Amino acid sequence: MSQKGKNKKWRSAGLYALLAIVLISLATTFLGNRPPERLEISYSDLISRVERGEVSKVLVETAPDGRQVAIAEAEINNRATQVQVNLPPLTPEFENTLVANGVELAVRPVQEEGLLGRILSTFFLPVLLLLGLFFLLRRAQNGPGSQALNFGKSRARVQMEPKTQITFNDVAGIDQAKLELAEVVDFLKNSERFTALGAKIPRGVLLVGPPGTGKTLLARAVAGEAGVPFFSISGSEFVEMFVGVGASRVRDLFEQAKQNAPCIVFIDEIDAVGRQRGAGLGGGNDEREQTLNQLLTEMDGFEGNSGIIVIAATNRPDVLDAALLRPGRFDRQVTVDRPDFQGRLEILKVHARGKTLSADVDLEKLARRTPGFTGADLANLLNEAAILAARRNLTEISMDEINDAVDRVLAGPEKKDRLMSERRKELVAYHEAGHALVGSLLPNYDPIQKVTIIPRGQAGGLTWFMPSDDDMGLTTRAHLKNMMTVALGGRVAEEVVYGESEITTGAASDLQQVARIARNMVTRFGMSDRLGNVALGRQYANIFLGREIAAERDFSEETAALIDEEVRRLVNEAYQRATYLIRENRALLDRIARRLVEAETIDGEELQAIIDNSEVVMLPPEEEPEPLTLPMAVNAGA
C-alpha cells in the first residue's frame, strides 16, 4: 500500500476514534453525573421517623455558608428511600435523639464548585471534541482525491504535465486519425503559424469508431504530447442519483478548464450523456438532458470558451444529439476504423516490443491472417501468445503459440477434456471436410488456413478461411453465392455419406448464415433477377433512439411471396452446386475426412497437397446442373 493510502487509512481510523470519544463523553456528562433522587421532608417529620425507627443513618453536610442539610436513609411505604432535610443549627437534643434510637450519625463538609467551574466541567470537553471533529471533517472534505460531500464538483482527472508515458510513437495503424490530433496539438504549441493565416483553433474533435480501435489510446497520446493541462473524464461520471449534479459538474469542469486555458478536455464515452433529447419509448430523461444542455452551452454558448479544446470518443455516433455534432462544438469528426493489412502490421510491431519472439515468428503473415482485428484484438492476441508460452515453460514465443492464440481469440479455448466417440469424430470430420472441399474447389474463393475437428466454444469443429481485405468491404454477387455454397458443404457431406435420415443439427448456424445472405441479396442488395434493383423493407433501427417505433413493410403480400421464392431459389442453387462438387469428388472427400480423423487438425498447405495429388472435378464453367428441388428448413426471417 502506498504512503498516501496509509495516511488516508489512519486519518479515517482517527475520525472514527474521535467520534466514539465524543459520544462517550457526552453520555458521561449528561447521564453519568446525575445525583440520586431524594425526597425532601420537614425537620419534625424526620424526628418522628427517627422515633418510629424508620431511619437507620443520617449524614449531615455543612456548606461553606454554614447551612446544614441532613440526608437520611429512611423506610417509606416499605421501601428504602433517601430523604433530605434543611436543619437548624445542631443541638444536643437532636444528637441525643439519634443516639437514643440507634441511628448512625455522620458529618462532612460540602465542597461546592463555582458557577464557572461547573460550566467548564460540564461543557468544555464535549465542545472541544466537537470542534476537533468539525475541523477534521473539513480537512478530509477538502483533501486531495476526496469528494465525500462535493457531489456537484467535477471528477475530472487533471494532468498539468504529461504523465501517461504514451506518445504518438506508440499509436500505429491509424495514421489519418493520428494526423488530425497531431495537428490539434501543434495548434496549441505553435498557434502563431496558424493564426497568421487567419485559422482558428478547432473547438472540438469527435473520435468515432468501433470498440478497440484506439480512440482512448489516441487521447492518452495527446495528453502525453500536448504540453498543456489535460482534463479527462468519462461521460457516465456526470450523472448521479442526485438531481442537478450533472449540470453542476459540467459547469465546474469548464470553470477549471477556463482557469487553466489553453487546455484539452477529454470526455470518454460521450454517448452516456450526449444521447438525443426526448427520444425513445420512455420519453426524455430530464437529468441527462439537463446535463447535455449545460454541455452544449459550455462548448458554444453565449460565453465563449477560448483556448479549450474538447476531445470526445464514442462508438455510437448514431445516438448523439444533432446539436452536439454541429460545427462550432465538434468541428472535426475523425473516424478511427479497423486497420488494414499495413496498419495491423505496424500495430503488431508496437505490441511486440518487450516480448521475446522466436525466429520463426512472421508478423507479416500474422497480419494477413487477422483481417477485421482491431488494435485491442491484436494486443490481446500477442498477450495470449505470451501467456501460452509461459504456461508451456518456454523462453520464447513461437509461431505455434501465436497460431493457438489466434484460434483462442476467435473461437475460444480448445475443449480437450471433451471425449468424442469414433462415430462422432468421423461425422464431424466429414462435415468439416465438406466445407473445406467446396471452399477449395470454388473459383476465386478465400484460401483455407486450417481445418480442425477439435471442439472450440460452441463449435464441434472449424474450417478457417483467410479472407482478403483488399476489396475495402465490397462483396460481389459471385462471392456471396460462393459463401452460401461453402456454408452448405457440411450439410451436403453428411447427406451424401450417411443419407438424408442421418443428417444432424450441426448445420444449424450454417443454414442461418445461408438464409441471411440470400435474403439480403434479394431485399437489400438488388441481386434478384425477378425483383430487380430495388431495396425492400425498411431497416430496423433501435426503437429506444426515437428513430423507429416499429419496422414497416413497404411491399405487398405478392412481393413478399416473391421474395420467399427468390430466397429459396438462391439457396437451392447453392445447395445444388455443393452437391455436385461433393458427389463428383467423393474419393477426395473421404481422403480429407480420414486425415482429419487421424491428425484432428490439418493446415491449408497440407490440404492443398492432398487436393493436388487427387483427381478433381470442378464446376462446369458455363452451364450448371439443373436445380434440385429439395425440402429445406430455411429460416426466411433470418
UniProtKB/Swiss-Prot annotation:
Gene3D superfamilies: 1.10.8.60, 3.30.720.210, P-loop containing nucleotide triphosphate hydrolases (3.40.50.300), Peptidase M41 (1.20.58.760). Keywords: ATP-binding, Hydrolase, Membrane, Metal-binding, Metalloprotease, Nucleotide-binding, Protease, Thylakoid, Transmembrane, Transmembrane helix, Zinc. CDD domains: RecA-like_FtsH (cd19501). The active site is at E432. GO terms for molecular function: ATP binding; ATP hydrolysis activity; ATP-dependent peptidase activity; metalloendopeptidase activity; zinc ion binding. ATP binds at G209, P210, P211, G212, T213, G214, K215, T216. PANTHER family: ATP-DEPENDENT ZINC METALLOPROTEASE FTSH 1, CHLOROPLASTIC-RELATED, METALLOPROTEASE M41 FTSH. This is ATP-dependent zinc metalloprotease FtsH. The gene is ftsH.
